[in-house]
Regions:
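Carbohydrate transferase catalytic cores enriched for Leloir-type hexosyltransferases
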Residues: 1-386
């Protein structure tokens, strides 16, 4: 990419999907690490303050007109088109099947984007692998949105080789457009400094950390069953969970989580901390004995990358993408085997010290800088004219 190539990124995520906003923040840091710090961030006008700390130029987009006819006529696209005229870029990323919620765009996109080069992003194909977690309407929304995206996207970015293989299998006609961008966490300097916040004032000295939103596929219940097994052996570790207690796909799930704590007799061992500020979440991971990542499915796991840059060991579900991420110090268990997870947790609880491990952090921090620059260079190659 030449110095004159202007890059535009579209805001993702928010309180309902923290992984999306971290994805964009880390990509901005990766570009800076690769020597290309200039970018324009497109976000809704009411989200500008959420992104101001990134320091990049922000292109605000007027909010949606909420009316079905407006969508059918593509009138909301005019708001994004106006922002793009005011802040022109040469390459725009990521366009997704959730564009309407992220930035107010509906398909088709040709008239809106005109000559701007762009790439689509499909985080994963979870609805194909775990259809039991989706209603027919939810699965159809994803399938239809992905089909519309693929019909127009000149490039489709996937976050892992595993996800790219899925796209080639499910949509073989589009295999030639696939690029893989494995993202990385950018460690901030303050993460390695003494923590001064009050959010962790009442936590125990030793604990396992589980840092996932409370969605069904994140598989918290297997962790709770493992704790029940350990309790029968007289081993009672603490587990601290972060993440919003809210699953839009299954609103009853948070109640099931709380009920499981009572039914398994582990309510006094598990703290549900809710959605913590990012710095407090990072400190929680630093201090943990290990992070437990029990997810049944991921496109690429942000929390695995977080643990990597903090030098913390992980107990991970044995799913293809976790094997692909291959974090140092990872120990794997079959995703729904509470028994094997219990064995791993018992060994870690009895033999591993709590963090932080300053030597491991220093090594991980150095490796993270190299890894981040590689991500930035990979993105610059994807965005280059072809």
């Amino acid at each position: 990419v030449t110095a004159s190539c202007r890059l535009g990124l579209i805001a993702q995520g928010g309180a309902g999907w923290m992984g999306g906003s971290e994805y964009i923040r880390n990509l901005l840091h990766a570009l800076a690490a690769a020597g290309n710090p200039e970018a324009t961030l497109f976000c809704f006008q009411n989200a500008v303050d959420d992104w101001r700390e990134t320091g990049v130029q922000i292109a605000p987009v007027q909010p949606l007109w909420q009316a079905p006819l407006v969508d059918r006529l593509g009138l909301n696209n005019r708001h994004f088109a106006a922002a793009l005229r005011a802040h022109p870029v040469d390459f725009l990323y990521p366009l997704t099947y959730g564009n309407r919620e992220n930035i107010g765009l509906t398909f088709p996109l040709r008239r809106t984007l005109r000559q701007t080069r762009w790439a689509g992003w499909i985080p994963d194909f979870q609805h194909r692998h775990l259809p039991r977690f989706f209603t027919p309407a939810q699965a159809a929304f994803r399938d239809q949105g992905i089909a519309r995206l693929l019909a127009e996207a000149p490039i489709v970015v996937m976050s892992s080789g595993s996800a790219a293989d899925d796209l080639r299998a499910f949509y073989p006609d589009y295999a030639g457009r696939v690029e893989v961008l494995r993202f990385a966490t950018c460690p901030r300097p303050e993460w390695y400094e003494p923590f001064t916040g009050s959010e962790l004032a009442s936590i125990p000295e030793r604990f396992f950390a589980v840092c996932n939103q409370f969605w069904l596929h994140k598989n918290h219940l297997t962790v709770f069953r493992a704790l029940a097994i350990l309790a029968e052996r007289g081993i009672r570790p603490h587990v601290l969970c972060t993440g919003a207690l809210d699953d839009v796909r299954d609103p009853a799930y948070p109640a099931q989580v709380r009920a499981a704590l009572q039914q398994n007799g582990i309510a006094d061992q598990v703290q549900l901390l809710g959605l913590l500020p990012r710095r407090a979440q990072i400190e929680l991971i630093r201090r943990s004995v290990a992070m437990v990542q029990p997810s049944l499915f991921e496109g690429w796991s942000t929390v695995v990358e977080d643990a990597r840059v903090l030098g913390r060991p992980l107990l991970l579900s044995d799913i293809p993408v976790h094997r692909e991420q291959a974090p140092p110090g990872g120990r794997y268990f079959p995703a729904e085997s509470a028994e094997i997870l219990a064995d791993l947790m018992a060994n870690a609880w009895e033999n591993w010290p709590a963090g932080p491990d300053l030597a491991a952090e220093a090594s991980a921090r150095n490796a993270a800088g190299i890894r981040l620059a590689e991500v930035g260079r990979c993105f610059l190659e994807i965005s280059a004219p072809r």
